[in-house]
Amino acid sequence: MNNPINICHLSEGIAGHNGQVLGVIKTIKDAGFKVEVEEVKVGWSIRPIRSILRFITRKLSRFPNKISIRCIQACYSLDPFKEFDIVISSGSNLAPINLALAKKYQAKNIHMSSIRDWSVGDFTAYITTTQVSFLPNNLRP
């Protein structure tokens, strides 16, 4: 029997974003894969300066390396989580932490939002409503 795919669902508690992620997870299940999902609550580490943290994380996500990944992680507050194979998130606030966790733990990652400062190429799959890149990982209807 195959081991299940461990999915880390990053959530900032926005119903529409969670619905999008759950739709992707359902699609993976419907394709015949066994999955285990852990929802990880995410917030800003210092809420009163969240606009500054948002700016910092977006700029740092342009150049993912060990230092920028640590800095990005310091800007967020995360629930503890177990080992995962795929990290999935939706909404522009979560793209930098999705990217950082995937790079740090060498996992695949899926994100849904409009493009900002980061590169579509840094995601295993980047789902948008319109084409934002000619890369094959930019998935759209």
Predicted regions and their residues:
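Active-site and donor-binding regions of nucleotide-sugar-utilizing enzymes
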Residues: 9, 14-31, 37-138
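Extreme N-terminal starter segment of soluble prokaryotic enzymes
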Residues: 2-8
